[in-house]
Amino acid sequence: MQYLFQIFYRLNSGGNKLYNQEIRNCIFQGNFNTLLKDLARSPDWLNANHLTKEKVETSRFNNEERILRFFAFYYDLDRYKGKLASFLNDFMRNHKDLTENVKNEYASLLSRSLKVAMEIEKLSTSKNVFEAVLIGIAANISALETKGADVINKLYKDVEGDKNFSEEALKEGLGSLEKVQNRINAAKIIFARG
């Protein structure tokens, strides 16, 4: 499969260049790929990201990739080596044929996490911040679902004040192993206080 991805990647030189998730969509067919497309059009995802279905349809699989990143970093952060494309390819390959139960667990985790995230008054639109916050919430979902918006917003302010979310930390090299791990782990720790 890695070779197939490389072939698509190399052939992809004329016209509109395909984004990596567009290539993954072609190669890693299965119910996980279908789930990503469904979740990108779900009311929870649309509301949390201030999107319409029409906007998702024209986003060239950007939303599906963001959801893939959520699952990949949530479940396999320890396998991330700093090479995002191959990490996401591996996660899709290894999860392309989910059982119905696992598929439902994935959908439920994202939906529950988004509902808590929607309590945040001024949630960042930065995909790296949003992703870390969502994973931090997911890691503590049972406790956070019982908290009010005031607690969720206080915890989010703590995230914003953390050095891993400073303007300097979010300037460059956002996909480096150290920065990804630091952001996500900081969000998990902060939201665990809830």
Residue spans of the language-model regions?
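Basic- and aromatic-enriched surface patches that contact anionic nucleotides/nucleic acids
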Residues: 1-85, 89, 145-149, 153-160, ...
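Generic detector of solvent-exposed, compositionally biased contiguous segments
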Residues: 33-44, 50-53, 101-123
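Short amphipathic alpha-helix initiation/capping segments at coil-to-helix junctions
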Residues: 60, 102-110, 122-130, 144-148, ...
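Amphipathic alpha-helical interaction surfaces
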Residues: 73-77, 94, 116, 136-143
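Small-residue-rich helix-loop
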Residues: 80-120, 129
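C-terminal hydrophobic structural anchor segments
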Residues: 118-165
